[in-house]
Amino acid sequence: MKIAVFSDTHGSTARMLRAAGELRADALVHLGDCERDADCLERAFPELPLYRVRGNCDVSPRAPEELVVSFGGVRALLCHGHRYAVDWGRLDSLVYAAQEKGCSLVLYGHTHRAENAEIGGVRLVNPGTAGMGPARSFALVEIFENGGVAAEIRPL
């Protein structure tokens, strides 16, 4: 299962839509800022499941602040990350939250810095910003039948 993960688009959707169209992903994730940009994904790819959460710049109650989903048997925590102080470079509270929820994968955003790490048995993936700055990026996460997880940060 391939999952295209975007975050922090801040109204800039063209590159995100192009990448999503080229990937042939099985699911799409938008991790907030701006949550309404997820609507663009939904309209462009109505056949794909879309998972969304809101970020610190989002006010719409349509998207939850966080979400726990199962991708091919792998439990994942989806959140923007701002409530876990990820912008201070600390990921321990995010790892703890994932462990408490029985998740082995966390998809988060907020920092505008891509991250792909494993801490305490939890894979942490931040796709970076899809909408701001010169280093725009997204993540492609692959879930294998044996429960393995691979993640790759790709430029936009």
Role assignments for model-derived ranges:
Residues 2-8, 75-81, 123-128, 151-153:
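Active-site-proximal beta-strand elements of phosphoester/diester hydrolases
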Residues 51-52, 57, 63-101:
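Glycine/small-residue-rich loop that forms an oxyanion/phosphate-binding "nest" at active or ligand-binding sites
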Residues 29, 51-53, 77, 107, ...:
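Hydrophobic/aromatic beta-strand patches that form the interior of the parallel beta-sheet core
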Residues 15, 65, 72, 96-102, ...:
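Binuclear metal-dependent phosphoesterase catalytic core
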Residues 25, 103-104:
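Proline-aspartate-enriched helix->loop->beta-strand connector
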Residues 2-71:
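Core catalytic region of metal-dependent phosphoesterases/phosphodiesterases
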Residues 42-51, 116-129:
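Short acidic, glycine/proline-enriched helix-loop-strand junctions
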Residues 10-14, 35-39, 57-62, 84-88, ...:
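Active-site environment of divalent metal-dependent phosphoester hydrolases
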